[in-house]
Amino acid sequence: MASSGQARERSTSSGRARLRKCSRAAPPGAPQAQDQTDSQERLIAFLESPESYPHSPAEVRLMQTHISWVFIASPFVFKVKKPMELGFLDFSTLEKRRHFCQRELELNRRLCPDIYLGVVPIYESASGFSFNAEGEIAEYSVKMRQLQSGWFLSQLLAKGLVGEKEIKRVICCLHRFYESEKPDPEIEVWGTPEKLKISTDENFVQVEPFIGRTISPVAFETIRHFTNQFYAGNEELFLERIKEHRILDCHGDLHLDHIHLTPEAITIFDCIEFNDRFRF
């Protein structure tokens, strides 16, 4: 299974991996933060070692997104959520990470029940980390079947192998999925401009500190202006979509890297679990 194009990757074939810092060092006077950083590095080293896994993979590859560590231990993938809080996402405690691992499992099984295998706890005792039930639960991972590289829709498109037939297969899969989702008044209210603006306004607020660094003031104000203009000019369209029950619990992050298309099967995976309103 691949992660998003933002991922960074490294691999190890045996023994203890050479670590690259994955968290900022804690400032002086913050021993608790430093302890968390040290624990994360030990956990990453454990999960990068092929000897750690019951099925003894030949190698382990680590891919990172901004919110997860993804360990590819063929034929399985183990995904661990980073302990962080970003406003729209909160993985800050072990219990919250357990909850969202379970949500990831449940939500993605709607579209690919054979890929998402279970939530696997990782234990820690005096002897270190283990998948065996020894000591206390230190972390949770989502265990998945690995998807064969070369068949992600982004890769097929780059090779010129996506035509009308392939697009129709994706459409048919999504149509069945949307038809299976029942309208829910509590979800449909999120189709109003007022509710949708919660997410876009939140995004603008979170981007403001980076104006002049990663986005120019003109670009920021232009995007915000046209976003708000679109809401104001299309209110009837938004309300019509609600009346026609078109607001459903969907995927939330549907792009080419999250569609896997072989001659035998189509797999749409990695929907958003950390914020329900992003899927509506």
Model segments located where?
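Conserved NTP-binding catalytic cores of kinases and kinase-like/nucleotidyltransferase enzymes
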Residues: 2-3, 9-143, 148, 265, ...
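Prokaryotic Sec-type signal peptides and long signal-anchor helices
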Residues: 7-8, 224
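ATP-dependent phospho-/nucleotidyl transfer catalytic cores
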Residues: 88-95, 129-135, 142-252, 260-280
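Catalytic-loop Lys-Pro-X-Asn motif of eukaryotic-like protein kinases
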Residues: 256
